[in-house]
Amino acid sequence: MVWYDYLAYIFAGFFLANGVPHFVQGISGKKFPSPFASPAGRGLSPPLVNALWGLANFFIGYTIIFKVGDFHFGMTRDVLMVGLGAFLAAVILSITFASRANPDS
């Protein structure tokens, strides 16, 4: 497999991890920041927008995993690349949103 397949799997993991908070907040009926809020990423979007945005992230991640390269759940390297993307999303997004929530930090 070529290197850009692994890069795509990292992006897939990022999309899958990013979809979780949007989807959960959406189906919980809570407002949550999204790219469609005003201002983008800072304002709060309605629950339906977040549920749909979460589903879109899941769809994008799923599509990348199964349409790019030759992904196999039995291949440790493939799964690790998706996990690395999810890990990077968790770290980057938690730092980003923590600094927005607490401007004094």
Which residues does each PLM region occupy?
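Membrane-interface extramembranous regions
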Residues: 1-105
